[in-house]
Amino acid sequence: MEPGSTVKPFTLLAALESGKFKPESVINTSPGRIKVSYKTFVDPHDYGRLDLAGILTKSSQVGTTKLALQLNPDTTRELFERMGFGESIGSGFPGETSGSLPSYRKWDPVTQSTFSFGYGISASALQLARAYSILASNGFRKEVSMVALDDAPESVAVIDPKLTGLIRTMLETAASDQGTGKRAMIDGYSVGGKTGTLHKVAATGGYDQHRYMSIFAGLSPVDQPRIVTIVVIDEPGIGDYFGGLVAAPVFSEVTGSALRLLQVPPPRLATKGRANPISRSRSSWSGGTC
């Protein structure tokens, strides 16, 4: 599957790692659209000036695109490679695939832009879970196992832990009342995560304008994560299809139940209540926005 906006945290991670941007760096997303060569990418609203956390919270295509175009394609791809995209996990699970991570030498500005928000790359839910587990484990990539292990799995440091902490904090805002993932909140636990909504590839090529995939990728608790959960809903029923409306509530229920089953003590009380559903406005980019 194409992971869509759930990989935006890794684009922000590449931006921070490059040294060209800081968390407080501001990107002007006005007027809510950007033309790159023959493509125009559009946000649901004109969000104006956004820092990096704001880009993630609003799931801004314009902000993400502007960041991506200022990065070297080879270093961006190399970071995704470190996160485990494009390679076999080695779980031994039947049917496991390595997904695809295209060579940066084939990228034009449009490809560089769409890659930054999860198009032109494919990954399994397990690969996405491993990538988020690197954020959860302070930059360490661990071996994947389908069964409980007596000894801790081997791990290797691939990302600066300070940067993974910054991204987790941004993900917490994205999964709050301010963000597209507000319905992923769990009473008593902090949650960090990112929504994804994308059109499915049509049998005739291009994207099908009437068939969707809704995703939520997240972790909890934010400060010391115990669980990473990936929710993928293939072609949700008639009505809502945004990841924040369809997949995020499933994350909340499943992850909350798992935390209680594991007897993880609530680190703090989560924000009470739920905010109003996110806007149904859609961008002219056929891949979806959040």
Which functions belong to the PLM regions below?
Residues G237-G239, R260:
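Short beta-strands and strand-coil junctions in structured, solvent-facing domains, enriched
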Residues A152-S155, R168, L245-C290:
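Short, gly/Ser/Thr-rich active-site loops of penicillin-recognizing serine hydrolases
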Residues M1-G4, F10-P236, G243, T289-C290:
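Beta-lactam-recognizing serine transpeptidase/beta-lactamase-like catalytic domain environment
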